Amino acid sequence: MTAFPDVPVIQYEGPQSDNPLAFRWYNPDEVIEGKTMKDHMRFSIVYWHTFRGTGADPFGPGTAVRPWDNGSESVENAQKRAVVAFELFTKLQAPYYAWHDRDVAPEGANLRETHANLDAVADVLEEQQKATGVKLLWGTANMFSNPRFMHGAATSCNADVFAYAGAQVKKALEVTKRLGGENYVFWGGREGYQNLYNTDMKRELDHLAKFFHMAVDYAKSIGFDGQFLIEPKPKEPTKHQYDSDAAACMNFLRAYDLDSHFKLNIETNHATLAGHTMMHELDYAGIQGGLGSIDANTGDLLLGWDTDQFPTDYYLTTQTMLMILKHGGIGTGGVNFDAKVRRESFEPIDLFHAHIGGMDAFAKGLKIAAAIRASGELADFVKNRYSTWDSGIGAKIEAGEVGFAELEAYMLEKGDVDANQSGRQEYLEHMINKYIDRV
């Protein structure tokens, strides 16, 4: 029995369509820069916000109307929920989905029962994947909700908690492999500290690295060849998280000899909380060879927390796709909608409106970014801005042919620097508007 009887499979109808249950910009088979939109985006829908979010907040209970969910933490309810999830995935033409272990299956009375619960729901997930063709983008373990993780998981001061976390990730890796997951994500929501008075940061970082090495070793032992990803976030729920931004993560990975095994899953709202733009985080990760996937959402600049709103801003999606195209795409990663409908958007149909809007925004962002790249206008401006490095003293500096003594001699002879040129920021911002207008 269908959970969404009034919703057809969402189709592309073009920019002039007034149908709210149609794509205006996302045409899966349209080829952009030699790849289809579907292959550029690899759209993914998250299980947690979409099927476990209730609309609850600190000031009131949930508002979401979900007729298929009886509200129980039973395996049977979880299995029923899984069938409904795949109806939504297929009607949105989303090729991927993503989960935390506790999203898809309830925690049991003990670890053995918890594992059995996950296996029972994985049976249904596997059946649904085979029936629909929808694939698992990535799995991960929820090591932040249960009170046992109050001090962290891999960074906990309690060695038993580290051990429990290891057992949980072991199982999550096994199920991710079973379901053909193409990546595995670590997000350290509790991996950090509230106060340094009671914290041995060095020991915690060492433990975190040891945990990741254990994950790499176990993945090899079971033949899981998916990409490991770390998702940066500076705070919330912890005051200071160790995976605070792309730079901190890449430094950590290099310091502990993990950089050949891990890339980054960059989220827009997390970049905002870290005081960065999404463009910055993507460019930095790409420069360092660490761009693996993205969590697509947006935050509210007037609020100081992770609001996980659906992305509908063409400037944001254009900037995001400019960086993804610049760095050669996202490989086995995807554009994963880690976003939730607002508390006031409580009806099932709102799930479709939200995802259609996000998918369309990214599709148009891709087209705009491709148009900017095809014209060469932005690239030529940047190249010309750095032209003094292409010859003369600039080329010698980059080639390592001169040191401070030679630089001093050069300037003593020259007398003063050549005049600087304008950065033309306003011109470039207006230029980007031109492409947004024309696509």
From Swiss-Prot:
Pfam family of the protein (one): AP_endonuc_2
Essential cofactor(s): Mg(2+)
GO MF assignments: magnesium ion binding; xylose isomerase activity
Cofactor note: Binds 2 magnesium ions per subunit.
GO biological process: D-xylose metabolic process
PROSITE patterns: XYLOSE_ISOMERASE
Subcellular location: Cytoplasm
Keyword tags: Carbohydrate metabolism, Cytoplasm, Isomerase, Magnesium, Metal-binding, Xylose metabolism
EC number: 5.3.1.5
Binding of Mg(2+) 2, residues: E267, H270, D306, D308
GO CC annotation terms, alphabetical: cytoplasm
Gene3D superfamilies: Divalent-metal-dependent TIM barrel enzymes (3.20.20.150)
Active site, UniProt feature: H100, D103
Binding site for Mg(2+) 1: E231, E267, D295, D338
Stated family: Belongs to the xylose isomerase family.
HAMAP family attached to this UniProt entry: Xylose_isom_A (MF_00455)
Subunit annotation: Homotetramer.
Name the record gives this protein: Xylose isomerase
Gene from which this protein is expressed: xylA
